[in-house]
Amino acid sequence: MTTTISQRKNRAAGANPLQKFWRKRRGDILPPIFGILGFLLLWQLISSAGLIKLPPPSSLWTDPRTRTLLMYPFYDQGGLDKGLFWQTLASLGRVAQGYSLAAIVGISTGILVGTQPLLDKALDPIFQFLRMVAPLAWVPIALVALQQNQPAAIFVIFITSVWPILINTTEGVKQIPQDYINVRKVLRLSPQKFFFKILIPSALPYIFTGLRIAIGLAWLAIIAAEIVMSGIVGIGFFIWDAYQQNYISEIILAVFYIGAVGLLLDRGIAYLQKLIAPGQ
């Protein structure tokens, strides 16, 4: 009996790290997998029964054009004839530019407004008004003002995603505990030390909340903008072009790409928050 118990312990100690990970995380991994498979199965049954006119998920493989897009995401024939990897990458490039600009402007302006109550009262109605404007409403304004698709698309991303960053940063600065302000006065901290030791750490949870909301809005905005703007490489224009040619399976495939990339972007910001501000 003692030998058997000892052997079991040795086997457990020498278990494959992958097996340990599976035993630890299978409760988190299996439910989403079953949920996704159940959704796809239900969709397949409803489409096959003719209850909806959308093609079933199996059409992503049975349709020759969509199967080619699945198997060759990196193909590039020049112009607009590119695989979905390059279409998605082009959209992500625009998102990176517009979102980065929004983060810089939103955080810096939010800190300024949050530390100046009079400025906050003066500008908050403007911020709240502008953030209610839908991304598509900015597209014609951006095209008229900038005259080019690429700068107009970046502007639409910026103007859509800057508001949650700015407003959440402002709120985070305003929520700094009064005790911290008193400590600053007692210790006579310099503005630089107050900024890095008190203000930024206190406001970080609010800033990252704004950043997570903004990355989703930025991704939605570029899809909407590219659908309206013709003749540019991007996942949004790819969807519109497929719709014009009635390639519904291609639209569904692109929607899967959009959802997957959006999820990865959100998880990326959440992971960045854990690295920079663990435990907050």
From Swiss-Prot:
CDD domains: TM_PBP2. PROSITE patterns: ABC_TM1 (PS50928). Induction: By carbon dioxide-limited conditions, probably via CmpR. The chain crosses the membrane at residues 32-52, 99-119, 126-146, 153-173, 198-218, 219-239, 251-271. GO terms for biological process: monoatomic ion transport. GO terms for molecular function: nitrate transmembrane transporter activity. Residues 88-266 form the ABC transmembrane type-1 domain. It comes from the Bacteria. Gene3D superfamilies: MetI-like. It is found in: Cell inner membrane. Keywords: Cell inner membrane, Cell membrane, Ion transport, Membrane, Transmembrane, Transmembrane helix, Transport. The complex is composed of two ATP-binding proteins (CmpC and CmpD), a transmembrane protein (CmpB) and a solute-binding protein (CmpA). PANTHER family: ALKANE SULFONATE ABC TRANSPORTER-RELATED, MEMBRANE SUBUNIT, NITRATE IMPORT PERMEASE PROTEIN NRTB. Belongs to the binding-protein-dependent transport system permease family. This is Bicarbonate transport system permease protein CmpB. It comes from Synechocystis sp. (strain ATCC 27184 / PCC 6803 / Kazusa).
